[in-house]
Design a protein with these regions (language model features):
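Short aromatic-glycine-(Arg/Gly/Cys) micro-motifs in beta-strand/loop hairpins
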Residues: 40-68, 84-87
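Short N-terminal "domain-start" leader segments
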Residues: 2-55, 79
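Residue-level detector of high-confidence beta-strand sites
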Residues: 31, 69-70
Length: 88
């Protein structure tokens, strides 16, 4: 657990550099720090993805990597998942 509040290292509008994987080139549409996970929950548009283009990820501040992706065909579905992930 953290000794203080989580400070986000990513902002809306950021284009992820990634590592050549699915997150590379994705645009952050929304982000919110998650104190429990010491990371951010992010909603992105990843048009080059071989999956559906809207995705929620957990973004690790320390490594700068995304993981636990949930993919959706529409922004609305992605946003609903973003809100759910913030509550869990």
């Amino acid at each position: 657990m953290s000794n203080g509040p989580v400070v986000s290292t990513i902002t809306t509008g950021t284009i992820l550099q990634g590592d050549g994987g699915v997150s590379t080139g994705a645009t952050v549409l929304a982000n919110k720090p998650s104190a429990d996970l010491e990371c951010d929950v992010i909603l992105c548009h990843a048009p080059a993805s071989s999956h559906d283009p809207f995705v929620t990820w957990i973004y690790n501040h320390e490594s700068g990597r995304c993981y636990w992706g949930h993919y959706f065909p529409t922004l609305e579905e992605g946003y609903e998942d973003f809100k759910k992930r913030l509550l869990s």
